[in-house]
Amino acid sequence: RDFCLSRGLGDVYKRQCVSKQNSAMIEEMLAYNREFVKNEGYKEYITNKYPDKKIAILSCMDTRLTALLPAALGIKNGDVKMIKNAGGVISHPFGSVIRSLLVAIFELGVEEIMVIAHSDCGACHMHSEEMLEKMKARGINADYIHMMSFCGVDFHSWLDGFEDTEKSVRGTVDFIVHHPLIPSDVKVHGFIIDSTTGELTRIV
């Protein structure tokens, strides 16, 4: 299976190219960055790698939460370890989210985990078939999709969203609590944050 995937993905990588020309938006960010460093804007953000509050937060990558979530919780740079993905969920028992949580716990001193989903989440009601069609429309070769399916990739479980946000939070918390590599003394909490007001509702 690994050989099958590596052969197929190798072909994918061959047809990809890295853009050496920045878009106007990237240029704007780079210009801002130069001024930020020149004016020593970084000084107020200096901290170390250890989270002061000993908390890791798993949340969604939704743009509405970028500034809202920290502001609503009163957290600043250096307070917590923030892990984000689409939906704030765990899709694999040994994937990047669990790996990040293990690093946070065993290497960085995290003692509590907060799973924070949000209202009106884009991952809710997301369907793999629709996304696969969008991939094909953007030029992804259907043969790659078929090859990956043949090699064991379950696109439905990987790309499908969830129907019930509260149920998703409960499932994610349960997944973490019962994971064999997560210590039993680590406290795990589940919440839903309002994407507009920032109000937090405890689920677990």
Task: For the regions a language model picked out, list residue spans one by one.
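Single conserved hydrophobic/aromatic residue that forms the stacking wall/gate
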Residues: R1-Q16
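Divalent-metal-activated hydrolytic enzyme cores
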Residues: C17-K53, G88-G95, I105-L108, A123-V204
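Divalent metal-coordination and catalytic microenvironments
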Residues: N33, I57, I83, V115, ...
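Conserved beta-strand-loop surface patch within small alpha/beta domains used
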Residues: N39, K43-I98
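Short hydrophobic segments within beta-strands
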Residues: L58-C60, I116, F191
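Gly/Ser/Thr-rich loops at beta-strand to alpha-helix junctions
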Residues: M61-R64, S119-A123
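Ordered, amphipathic secondary-structure segments that act as subunit-interaction surfaces
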Residues: F106-H118
